[in-house]
Amino acid sequence: MMQRVLDYVLANAEKNNPSSILQNIDKFTIESGEFLMNVGPEKGKILQSTLRKHEPLKILELGAFIGYSAILIASTVGNNASLYSIDPDQNSIDISEKMVDFAGLSNKVNFINSTAELAIPKLNHPFDFVFIDHAKKRYFPDLILIEQSRLLKPSSVVFADNVGIFIDDMKEYLDHVRNSGLYKSENVASCLEYRNNVYDAVEISIME
């Protein structure tokens, strides 16, 4: 399926136009009826608004999938910003790299083919912004690992997708960002990607 999405984008989207690429991914999803676990257009607006507000220079992403959020993030932040995107699936990395290259954003995005658990301790600088959208049961342990690896600093933003629809998997994560005293955290209601009648939410947590 990921290859079919890429083929559709290459055939229909405008090269070096991130908005056109994202719109065509959305269009493929709606027309095909297949569910793609992108952040999607509705929660994407919340993500863009948060990025514009905080203007991060170093961004970490957990979960690349097909490069949708990498394109959205890289096209929203400034030219001197850089994104590091971690995903354990080689096919996801390959598709994402091609998507990002077609969007003209390869100079701002670095893909790491690894589990977050193995990659995080090897990162050697703090991040201004972390976008979490990978295996839901890994949100909490990987955030703890990020903290232990000293990859966050005061004012760092942690933006977690799907905390509404997967609430049962998010209890430890949400309890930590809301009650540990490390963050000021806000829950923003939205809808599941490409399912406007299904509730979802994002959690935006700022390290204090």
Describe the residue ranges of each PLM region.
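A short acidic, Gly/Pro-enriched loop at the edge of an enzyme's catalytic core
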Residues: P121-V130
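A generic alpha-to-beta junction signature in SAM-dependent methyltransferases
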Residues: T76-V77, L123, R150-L152
